[in-house]
UniProtKB/Swiss-Prot annotation:
InterPro entries: FAM124, FAM124_dom. Residues 434-470 are annotated as: Disordered. Belongs to the FAM124 family. This is Protein FAM124A. It comes from Xenopus tropicalis.
C-alpha cells in the first residue's frame, strides 16, 4: 500500500468517483507452483491486441500444490468469465490468430454455447469458451460489427440471487447499470476512444448453479469503507491495511481495496513532467497491419454516433495531449515489460495524482503512412506513469502480511483532470458560422417548425403545405412513408446487432 508521505497540495483533492479508473476492477489468478509465468504470458498475448498497458490480471503462485477436486456436475457453471470483443473492421486475421492461440497449451477447451447475432467466421453457430487451469475464469473472443473493442468481466449468477447481486455490485462499483435485461446487465468501468472495460452479470437458468472459482479473486477499488461495509450481505474481514475480503450472494470471493482521495498536482509538477516527456521512451502497442489499415474506418464509425460513450464525459483524451504525442518521434526501441514479483500482488493506492499525460491512449501518428509498413504495424500508446508512486508495499492476499518486494505491474492510471482543451473548442465552428449556414433559402423558414408525423399528414383534411400543389403534396407524403420504412428497418437492424453483445 502507499502511505500519504507528501503533504497535501494546494488546489484541492479529486475524488476517485469523479474520474475514470481503468483498474477499478482487476483479477488475481493463483496458479500452482511453477506455472505462474506460463499463465501470465498466455494472458498478456491476448490483451496486447487491445492495449499492452492494461495489466488487469496478475498470476501468482500458491506455496503448496493444491489437490484437484472432482469436476462438478453438468448443471454447474464457472462463475467468472472474461470476454474480449474485437472489431470486425480489423479483419478476421486477429480473430483466427487468437482462436489458434486457444488451441495451444496452457489453454484448454471448456464448452460451447449457442449465441445470437452474427457469428465468428470459424464457428458459424457457436461460441467457444476456454480456460487456463482449474479454478480460473472462462475466456472467449467475440467478433463485433460496430462500436469499440471491449474487455468484459462477467459473473454468472444463480437465478434466485441475480437481482440482489445487481444491487450489491452497483453499491461497490458506484455506477449505474448501462444495459439491462431480465437476465443480463452491464456496468461501465472505463471508456476511452479505442476500447471499453465493462463489468456484467448474467443470470443462469433455474436449476443451474454457478461454481465460485477457488483460484481467482475479483478486486474492486472502493472509497468509503465505512458506508459500504454495513450494506454488504456477508461479513467483511480485513486482510491488510486498506484491504478487505468478503463474498457475494453466490459465494464468490472478492477483495475490496480502499482508494484514497487523490491530490492534484501543482503547476510546477505538470511543467516538470512535460519537460521530461520528450525524453521518455514510449511503449508500443503491438497491432497487426490489418488493424492499422482499418483504424480510420473504425474512428469514422465512432464519430457518427454509433458508439455510446458511457461512464462519464469523454474528457480523458484532450486534444492538447494528441498534439503532444504527434510531436514525438517514433521510438526505436520496444517497451520493456514491467517487472513482476512472484507474490500475490496488491493494486497500490496513490498519495498523489498522476500527471495528465499518464494513461489515455493516443491516436496513430499522422506521419506513419500506411504505405511505409512492410511488417506488422506498431501503434503508439503513452506509457502509464509510475514515477509518482511512493512507498509501495505489497500484501499477500491470503495472509495479509506485508512483502518486501514491490510489484508495479498494475498501477492506478487515472484520466486527466482537465476538461476539453481550448484547441478543441477553437476547432469547432462558432455560433456565427452556424447562424450563417442556416440562412440558406428555403431552410430558414422551416428550421423552427416541427415536422409533422406521417399519421398527421395522412389524416389531415386540409393541405399541410397550403402553397404546394396537390401533386407535390402526394410526392412529399410518399417520401415520408419511405423514410418511415427506412427508420423501421434501421431499428430492427440495430436490435439484431445488439445481440452481439449479449453473451
Amino acid at each position: 500500500m502507499i502511505g500519504r508521505t507528501r503533504e497535501q497540495k494546494q488546489g484541492g483533492e479529486l475524488s476517485v468517483e469523479d474520474i475514470q479508473d481503468p483498474f477499478l476492477v482487476s483479477i488475481h489468478i493463483i496458479a500452482d507452483p511453477g506455472e505462474s509465468k506460463c499463465l501470465q504470458e498466455a494472458i498478456d498475448r491476448l490483451l496486447v491486441w487491445i492495449h499492452p498497458d492494461l495489466q488487469l490480471f496478475c498470476v501468482s503462485e500458491r506455496r503448496v500444490l493444491k489437490k484437484k477436486k472432482p469436476s462438478k456436475s453438468f448443471a454447474s457453471h464457472p462463475a467468472l468469465a472474461i470476454i474480449l470483443f474485437l472489431q470486425e473492421d480489423y479483419g478476421e486475421e486477429q480473430i483466427l490468430h487468437l482462436h489458434k492461440c486457444f488451441q495451444k497449451p496452457p489453454w484448454q477447451f471448456h464448452h460451447t454455447e449457442r449465441v445470437h447475432g452474427k457469428f465468428l467466421p470459424y464457428m458459424p453457430c457457436n461460441q467457444d469458451f476456454f480456460t487456463l487451469a482449474n479454478g480460473t475464469p472462462l475466456w472467449a473472443i467475440r467478433q463485433v460489427h460496430y462500436g469499440k473493442e471491449i474487455i468484459r468481466f462477467t459473473i454468472y449468477c444463480s437465478y434466485e440471487n441475480f437481482a440482489d447481486m445487481m444491487k450489491m455490485y452497483e453499491l461497490i462499483i458506484k455506477k449505474r447499470v448501462w444495459r439491462k435485461k431480465t437476465d443480463f446487465c452491464v456496468f461501465p468501468v472505463y471508456s476511452n476512444m479505442d476500447f471499453d472495460i465493462e463489468f456484467s452479470l448474467k443470470r443462469l437458468v433455474k436449476g443451474q448453479k454457478p461454481v465460485p472459482l477457488e483460484s481467482s479473486l475479483l478486486e474492486f477499488r472502493v472509497r468509503d469503507f465505512g458506508q459500504l461495509i454495513p450494506l454488504l450481505p456477508n461479513q467483511c474481514s480485513p486482510i491488510s491495511e486498506g484491504r478487505w475480503k468478503t463474498e457475494d450472494h453466490d459465494g464468490n470471493k472478492i477483495l475490496l481495496q480502499q482508494a484514497q482521495c487523490l491530490a492534484r498536482k501543482t503547476a510546477w509538477k505538470h511543467q516538470n513532467y512535460a519537460s521530461r516527456t520528450a525524453a521518455m521512451t514510449q511503449p508500443l502497442s503491438i497491432a497487426p497491419r490489418s488493424r492499422k489499415l482499418k483504424y480510420g474506418k473504425h474512428k469514422a464509425r465512432a464519430s457518427h454516433g454509433q458508439v455510446q460513450h458511457f461512464g462519464g464525459s469523454q474528457t480523458d483524451f484532450p486534444m492538447g495531449q494528441v498534439d503532444t504525442f504527434r510531436s514525438l518521434k517514433f521510438p526505436s526501441e520496444a517497451a520493456q515489460a514491467f517487472q513482476r514479483s512472484k507474490s500475490l500482488y496488491c493494486l497500490p493506492t496513490m498519495s498523489t495524482f498522476p500527471s495528465c499525460h499518464s494513461f489515455p491512449m493516443s491516436e496513430p501518428h499522422p506521419c506513419f503512412g500506411l504505405d511505409t509498413y512492410e511488417t506488422p504495424a506498431w501503434r503508439i500508446s503513452p506509457k502509464i506513469n509510475i514515477d509518482d508512486l511512493e512507498g509501495v508495499e505489497e500484501t499477500d492476499v491470503d495472509t495479509g502480511m506485508k512483502l518486501s518486494s514491490s510489484d508495479l505491474s498494475v498501477v492506478s492510471a487515472y484520466s486527466p483532470l482537465n476538461g476539453p482543451c481550448s484547441d478543441l473548442e477553437a476547432s469547432l465552428p462558432s455560433e456565427g458560422a452556424l447562424a450563417q449556414s442556416d440562412t440558406v433559402p428555403g431552410r430558414q423558414n422551416h428550421s423552427s417548425d416541427s415536422l409533422h408525423s406521417v399519421s398527421d399528414i395522412s389524416s389531415s383534411p386540409c393541405p399541410v403545405f397550403p402553397s404546394t400543389p396537390a401533386q407535390s403534396q402526394k410526392h412529399i407524403l410518399s417520401h415520408y412513408h419511405q423514410l418511415s420504412e427506412i427508420t423501421s428497418h434501421l431499428s430492427e437492424t440495430l436490435n439484431i446487432e445488439e445481440e452481439e453483445f449479449y453473451i
